[in-house]
Amino acid sequence: RSCLSDTIDLGELVSLEETEELKELKARYEKMYSNNRKVQALDATVDDFFSSNIYAIRELPVTIKVRTVASGSTTSNSYLFCDGAGKEVTLGNSSTSLGSRFYLKILPATSGIPYLIYSSASNTPLSVGYYTNAPDDKILMTAKDNSGSLYSAGWDLIPSTYKGYFSIQSESYLGQSDPNNSWSVFYHVLEAKANNKLGYAQRVNYRAQQEFLITPTASFTLQNVTFDLENATISNGAVISKVTSLTNVHEYTTNENLTINFNAEETSNFYETAGTLKVNISSPSSIKFPRPRPIAGKAVLMGDESKDAIYSSATQKLSAPVEYSTSIEMKPRCLLQLTTKFKTFILNVPYVAVAKYGDREIKVRGTWRGYSVADPELNKPINEPHYF
């Protein structure tokens, strides 16, 4: 089983309570950091929608998956799992069972607790705990009910450099890394251990056993996309060459009108930027967006574009009819082969997408990438005549 209930040899499973030692460690920590509650780990790598997005997923079911299990554990057992109240939370292989569902509660800032994490199976908070016959071996457990103290149930989520992953830091369980240095105080973070168990350790950057992917099971439905045209970049693409042959059988110069028609293939891709929080966005096939066009070196939306771009990172190919009319001077009694070169452009346009689940709204950033044939009326093609 992936969730262990109380056993006789280990004793009773109980939640961590505040001790004089923990009080002293916390006092030293706060003094060391000028009375800040803790060192803030958030930095410039955290996207500007993280706070609003994580608030939007509050109390929605999430799965919590460790990036890499510890040596001595089953590789497929990477999801937090527990099937009831007052039980140990361990690692299981299911991402769909009720036991692998959890949800976040966000308390007011005045509470001093950033997050509570609840088990959907027990509807009680996760907390630091231990078995009475092994008090030094702290584990993760679900509270027996909702009537007790939340002292050991407070958590903070510290974003990893791996987008979507977090260190899950206890707000109550402190330690001292060097017994000879009373100021070497730290907050423990959750860590995957051997035998599919969970324990705690001092946080180490990039340690895969300390990083957990928190993913809402709900899919947010795309509502709209707003392009940041001012910060778009445009580069030249490969020209499209079309050859037209004409003859003049007369003994004098003539001017010939000609029209070149063809269908070009344009492309569209929406690439989401990996955010601090991983969310799933679905886009119905009925929702389509206009594509920015290249005009005078800028990406623009004139308002008359057809809505034909679907929200997908897969390359969408679109047919673009091109028509170009011009006149050319024909020398007497000649064959003309006219090469007309049409300009193309590659556009990279930042965007913000808004998606909803019920009344919950999340936002993500991304880049739309498009390959576009220039309008020949606005970007004149190059004509290269060859007379024979």
Where in this protein do the model-derived segments appear?
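Lectin-like carbohydrate-binding module/patch detector with strong preference for beta-trefoil
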Residues: 7-224
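Core pore-forming/fusogenic effector modules of secreted, proteolytically activated toxins
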Residues: 16, 43-48, 196-280, 299, ...
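Short hydrophobic membrane-inserting alpha-helices and related fusion/pore-forming segments
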Residues: 279-299
